[in-house]
A protein has these predicted regions:
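Conserved beta-strand positions in the central sheet of alpha/beta enzyme cores
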Residues: 34-35, 133-134, 165
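Generic beta-sheet signal
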Residues: 87, 135, 186-187
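An N-terminally biased module of ancient metal coordination in phosphate/nucleic-acid-related enzymes
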Residues: 1-86, 90-91, 122, 152
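Beta-strand-turn-beta hairpins that frame and shape the catalytic cleft
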Residues: 80, 97-101, 127-131
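Charged catalytic cores and adjacent phosphate/nucleic-acid-binding surfaces used
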Residues: 1-9, 18-23, 44, 93-110, ...
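Aromatic-lined carbohydrate-recognition surfaces of secreted/lumenal glycan-active proteins
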Residues: 131-143
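Hydrophobic beta-strand scaffold residues
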Residues: 84, 132-133, 183
Length: 252
C-alpha cells in the first residue's frame, strides 16, 4: 500500500487544493495519503508573516480545514479506495537553522499552537492518538531553509517522536538511516512536479489506526516513485529491516 505522509494544500503554501491533491494521488493508485498543511507559530516575525500572507493554518481556518479533509476522505474512499489522514506540520521557523523545527502530526483532530517547545508539541500530538514525526530533520540536500533543531535534540526527543523522516522528496538522508531511529519517507509535496519522490509502503489493513500503528511499530518499507507523466515510472524498494547501511556512503 503506497503512501505519502507529507504534503501541502492551498490552506498553507501548496499549489493544489485538497480535492486536487486527492485526485493527484488517487488517480495514481496510492493507498494512503496524509495532508499536512503548515501550522506556524504566531509569536515570531516569520510566523506572523506567514499568517499575514495566508500561508498557515490558524484557529479561524482550522475547522474548515478539518471539514474539507473529512469530506474529501469520504470521496477518496469511494472513488479511489484511498485513505486520507488529517494532519498538520507544526512550523517553528527562525533566522537560524539550528533553531528551526518542523513536526508533523498525523491523525490529528485538534488545533495545537506551534509556539510551545517541541517536547510539548510532540506530547500534544500524541495525546490526540496521533503520531508525531520529525520533518526533514537534517540537511535536505536542497538550497532552502533548513530545520536542524529536532535533530540537535534527538537523544532528548527520541522517546517522544514516533518517527523521523529518512527522505524528503528525491533525497535519502544517510544520517537518519544510520541513526537507529524509527523512520518514514515522504515527498513534502507543494506542487505536482514534486510527485516523484521516496514514499512509505505499508502492508497493514487500510484503516487509520492500522496505519498509525504500523508507523509506531515500524512495519513498513520505502519505495522511490517516479511519476510516469514526468518520466518513466520506476519503483525501488528499501525495507527497514534490510537497509544495508554498511554499504551507504559516509553521512553528511
Amino acid at each position: 500500500m503506497l503512501a505519502d505522509l507529507h504534503m501541502h494544500s492551498t490552506f498553507s503554501d501548496g499549489k493544489l487544493t485538497i480535492p486536487e491533491l486527492v485526485d493527484l494521488f488517487g488517480s495514481r493508485g496510492f493507498g494512503v495519503i496524509a495532508i499536512t498543511d503548515h501550522l506556524c507559530e504566531d509569536v515570531t516575525p516569520i510566523g506572523k508573516a506567514a499568517r499575514y500572507l495566508g500561508r498557515t493554518l490558524t484557529p479561524a481556518t482550522f475547522p474548515l480545514y478539518l471539514e474539507i479533509l473529512k469530506s474529501e476522505a469520504e470521496r477518496a474512499r469511494e472513488q479511489y479506495g484511498m485513505l486520507v489522514l488529517p494532519g498538520f506540520e507544526l512550523t517553528k521557523n527562525s533566522a537560524l537553522n539550528h533553531r528551526s523545527a518542523h513536526m508533523l502530526g498525523i491523525g490529528i483532530s485538534e488545533y495545537v499552537p506551534a509556539s510551545a517547545d517541541p517536547l510539548e508539541l510532540a506530547r500534544a500530538i500524541r495525546v490526540q492518538g496521533a503520531v508525531a514525526i520529525a520533518a526533514h530533520p537534517v540537511h535536505t540536500r536542497k538550497v532552502e531553509k533548513q530545520t536542524y533543531h529536532l535533530w540537535d535534540r534527538r537523544e532528548e526527543l527520541a522517546a517522544e517522536l514516533d518517527a523521523w523522516e529518512v527522505a524528503s522528496g528525491p533525497y535519502l538522508f544517510d544520517e537518519v538511516l544510520r541513526s537507529g531511529l524509527p523512520m518514514v519517507a515522504s515527498g513534502d509535496l507543494h506542487q505536482p512536479e514534486q510527485l516523484s519522490s521516496w514514499k512509505t509502503v505499508f502492508e497493514c489493513e487500510k484503516h487509520p489506526e492500522a496505519v498509525l500503528d504500523a508507523i509506531r511499530k515500524q512495519e513498513l518499507s520505502f519505495r522511490f516513485f517516479q511519476d510516469s507523466i514526468y518520466g518513466k515510472e520506476q519503483l525501488h524498494d528499501v525495507r527497514v529491516g534490510d537497509l544495508g547501511v554498511g554499504a551507504l556512503p559516509d553521512a553528511v
